Curated annotation (Swiss-Prot):
Residues 1-31 form the signal peptide. Brain specific mainly in the limbic system and faintly in the spinal cord but not in cerebellum. It comes from the Eukaryota. It comes from Homo sapiens (Human). It is not sure whether N-glycosylation is on Asn-165 and/or Asn-166. The gene is CREG2. It is found in: Secreted. Belongs to the CREG family. Glycans are attached at residues 165-166. Keywords: Glycoprotein, Secreted, Signal. This is Protein CREG2. One of its GO terms (cellular component) is endoplasmic reticulum.
Length: 290
């Protein structure tokens, strides 16, 4: 009787040990599954890499509790069998299990809320306050001079929107016909007046450069007209109360009063573009007391 040489059959104990090792290695993978396309699980190595590479200041705002997008993993048949046990629409939902460690999630764009800009009332009040506090401004006109005809021409002029206790929001001027600005206005009465906050409380205490964008700048655009005889007395009070030296200016220059019929208001009080203010909000606003 011949004995055939061959491999010895595997022992039951060895096969059982091999199965136990495989199940131990695969058991962590059955813990959680991804049910949302915006999150994923990461390993400890990737976690350390994210921590070391992430230097943006906005990163804390991107992290959120996304436990609701993670669920315990079950076979597909279990989800189908439990469909009739799920709460109906409108019923109170149970709190989802906490998210496991090592989970990273991006916040969706729809959930982000940006800080709202100042409202129209606040902008209008700031504009009226600056208009009342300003004693001078830069008036830009369309030049009629031959060398620069049709180009903008600017001139710094004393202004006033009324006496200290009576703000109108309308800038008044004390002009002479010999000023080139008046010659420009006779042909084209449209002009722009820029009022800077160079002497404001904030700029004086916090800003070195008065032209810093954080200093408020108000631009009024409209039609320059002569003050009617009925308003001359008020114009005198407005200008002479803020500029007493005007009373002694030489009379041979034939001084007269003008004002701007405002059509557009623009306010800049931070980095970036200017904000438009409606005439209704501008004249309705009450300037802050100094």
């Amino acid at each position: 009787m011949s004995v055939r040489r061959g491999r010895r059959p595997a022992r039951p104990g060895t096969r059982l040990s091999w199965l136990l090792c495989c199940s131990a290695l695969l058991s962590p993978a059955a813990g959680y599954v991804i049910v949302s396309s915006v999150s994923w699980a990461v390993t400890n190595e990737v976690d350390e890499e994210l921590d070391s590479a992430s230097t943006e200041e906005a990163m804390p705002a991107l992290l959120e509790d996304s436990g609701s997008i993670w669920q315990q993993s079950f076979p597909a048949s279990a989800h189908k069998e439990d469909a009739h046990l799920r709460p109906r629409a409108g019923a109170a939902r149970a709190r989802p299990p906490p998210a496991p460690p090592g989970m990273f999630s991006y916040r969706r764009e729809g959930g982000q809320t940006a800080s709202a800009p100042p409202g129209p009332r606040l902008r209008a009040a700031t504009a009226r306050s600056l208009a009342h506090a300003s004693v001078w401004g830069c008036l830009a006109t369309v030049s009629t001079h031959k060398k620069i005809q049709g180009l903008p021409f600017g001139n710094c002029l004393p202004v006033s929107d009324g006496p200290f206790n009576n703000s109108t929001g309308i800038p008044f001027f004390y002009m002479t016909a010999k000023d080139p600005v008046v010659a420009d206005l006779m042909k084209n009465p449209m002009a722009s007046l820029m009022l800077p906050e160079s002497e404001g409380e904030f700029c004086r205490k916090n800003i070195v450069d008065p032209e810093d964008p954080r200093c408020v700048q108000l631009t009024l655009t409209g039609q320059m007209i002569a003050v009617s005889p009925e308003e001359v007395e008020f114009a005198k009070q407005a200008m002479f109360s803020r500029h007493p030296g005007m009373r002694k200016w030489p009379r041979q220059y034939e001084w007269f009063f003008m004002k701007m019929r405002i059509e557009h208001i623009w306010l800049q009080k931070w980095y970036g573009g200017a904000s438009s203010i409606s005439r209704e909000e501008y004249f309705k606003a009450v300037p802050r007391k100094a």
